[in-house]
Amino acid sequence: MIKLSFRPVNGLTAILFIGVLLLIDQWVKIYIKLNYPLTLYGQDAIVDWGFFKLLFVENKGMAMGTRLDTILPFLSEKTAKLLLTSFRLLAIMGLGYWLWDSLRQKNNTVLPYALSLIFAGALGNIVDSVFYGVWFTSSYGQVANWASGSGYAPLFFGHVVDMLQFPLVEWTWPEWLPWIGGERYLFFEYIFNAADSWITIGVMLLLLFNKKIFPPQGEKIQV
């Protein structure tokens, strides 16, 4: 059985780790933004290796393109976007406190890694949502530039840049199946970015080491 071990993390290490992850995420996004126009999902891919595609799409909503005004249709698109960005800011403040507390206690090694990954990913997407509308011109039908005056959207109304897709398996559901019969299905069709990957890895660490990170009351933390 393979046993994973994690080196203890201090505050400086966590900051550097988050900084490197954030730098990677933002470098990729800005490079894509300043060199390519928006692509249409499977069409005009920047890179197309079959199992992997490098694209450029902008996400106005949440994970997998879900939009808050679609879930709550009584909200306008503008209100939904502002609420979503505000929620993200509150969430990252909570994550920051949780990370600080885990570092302060010094009795857990895997939790700071997991929280640092999630924090870096959340922060990366918040930068897009808050600042990209002001920093850049539009990418629709053209390559964006740094905005010398006004950008494509006001502060807090930027779009998250996504570019990675792994369409590994494609099939058509049998006709006899109710509701989905005859429909094409692609796994994994969703387009994401490096920040989403950091969040996913962090959440997976929390799930994999759940019993060690959050042991029953009275038991000693083992990680």
Regions found by a protein language model. Name each.
Residues 1-223:
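Alpha-helical transmembrane bundles and membrane-interface segments of multipass inner-membrane proteins
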